[in-house]
């Protein structure tokens, strides 16, 4: 049985979607939750209330994941509040999809900063604490697009592929300190982003998936739970795809 009782997790970009599902599932297993998003809103307030109703401590910190200094401030606030940090989930992400010839420098920079630089920011800030503890699990959210690419998503694909190389390198640096680092590569998952697509576009997406359906956010969260728990105590430097056999 998975038990995260007394552990502390920080999840970036967690007010909605996959991050929210991870926060709720971790809380169901006794984990105290700190989470970030770009600003406080109804989603973040509702998640805080829901987490507290599950009997765990919950802390929301509004923060821009792409800001290096802010990431260090967030980690310090988490440690000051909970006394430790056991699990880091780098989940913050955005898209600015367009064909390469139409892509602006700003669209490229925005996606790389939020999706990839944020992983560096938070890992850089969190690893000293985890090294002092001589334990920790780092989980970063990549994507099927980071593995196989996708037309119109060169910036997004580059950011998600970069996460894979970063996590594999980090696992080799930190393994001797009993800190594990892994990535999850979701396929098409039902989130507000995919639900907003026209029905015909979503139908075409589903045709590409051998299991003939989109994934649920909870299905990604279950993999994160495995990677956060002792069930994966000898798993590090891996990329686990959650894509319905799409890749």
PLM region descriptions:
Residues 29-46:
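Conserved glycine-rich Rossmann-like NAD(P)H-binding loop of the short-chain dehydrogenase/reductase
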Residues 179, 213-242:
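C-terminal substrate-recognition "lid" of short-chain dehydrogenase/reductases
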Residues 99-100, 107-112, 194, 205:
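Substrate-binding pocket helix/loop in short-chain dehydrogenase/reductase
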Residues 128, 172-176, 233:
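Alpha-helical segment proximal to the catalytic Tyr-Lys
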Residues 143:
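Residue(s) in the substrate-gating loop at a strand-loop-helix junction
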Residues 123, 159, 167:
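Active-site helix of classical SDR
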Residues 8, 15-17:
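Conserved glycine-rich cofactor-binding loop
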């Amino acid at each position: 049985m998975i038990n995260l009782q007394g552990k502390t997790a920080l999840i970036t970009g967690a007010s909605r979607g996959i991050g929210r599902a991870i926060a709720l599932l971790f809380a169901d297993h006794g984990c105290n939750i700190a989470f970030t998003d770009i600003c406080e809103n109804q989603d973040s307030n509702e998640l805080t209330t829901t987490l507290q109703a599950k009997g765990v401590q919950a802390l929301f910190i509004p923060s821009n994941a792409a800001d290096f200094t802010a990431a260090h401030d967030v980690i310090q606030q988490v440690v000051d509040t909970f006394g430790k940090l056991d699990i880091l989930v780098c989940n913050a992400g955005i898209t600015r999809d367009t064909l390469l010839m139409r892509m602006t420098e700003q669209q490229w920079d925005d996606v790389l900063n939020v999706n990839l630089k944020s992983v560096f920011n938070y890992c850089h800030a969190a690893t000293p604490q985890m090294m002092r503890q001589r334990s920790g699990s780092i989980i970063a959210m990549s994507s099927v697009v980071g593995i196989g690419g996708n037309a119109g998503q060169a910036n997004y694909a580059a950011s998600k592929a970069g996460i894979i190389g970063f996590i594999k390198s980090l696992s080799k640096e930190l393994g001797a300190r009993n800190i594990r680092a892994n990535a999850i590569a979701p396929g098409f998952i039902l989130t507000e982003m995919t639900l907003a697509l026209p029905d015909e576009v979503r139908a075409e997406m589903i045709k590409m998936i051998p299991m003939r359906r989109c994934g649920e956010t909870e299905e990604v969260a279950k993999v994160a739970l495995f990677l956060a728990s002792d069930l994966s105590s000898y798993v590090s430097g891996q990329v686990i795809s959650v894509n319905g056999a799409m890749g």
